Amino acid sequence: FDTCHVHAAGYDVVSKDGWRKTLDALDAACGLGLVRVIHANDSKKERGCRVDRHERIGHGAIGSKGFANLMTEPAFENVPKILETPKDEEGKWDREGLAALRKLARKKAGG
């Protein structure tokens, strides 16, 4: 499951209702249980653009709301997530992206 690909294909992962509809479509197509890894990346382009341009977590069109949906989704709680985002030489952007995702996950846990 690649967040940018899904967004670029026109699925709404940002609104709560859109997230539920996206997961329902995925479940109907192949089953949520078959998702074995998630490529977490924001999108430089708008939803439905059919263009795969990754952006740093929280810096694109998916934004924090979309990643809050992902990180608090019970079906994906134990699914590994891989940052597939632009890189800087010092690794600062990856550290920031991981921190943002962890913070969103903690909100579900009440932290």
Model regions: which residues?
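Acidic/histidine-rich catalytic cores of soluble enzymes
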Residues: 1-56
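A generic structural micro-environment signature
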Residues: 12-13, 46, 63, 68, ...
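Short, electropositive alpha-helical surface patch
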Residues: 17-20, 24, 51-68, 90-109
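A structural motif corresponding to the C-terminal end of an alpha-helix
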Residues: 29-33, 66-79, 104
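Residues that cap or initiate secondary-structure elements
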Residues: 44, 87-89
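Short acidic/histidine-rich active-site segments
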Residues: 80-86
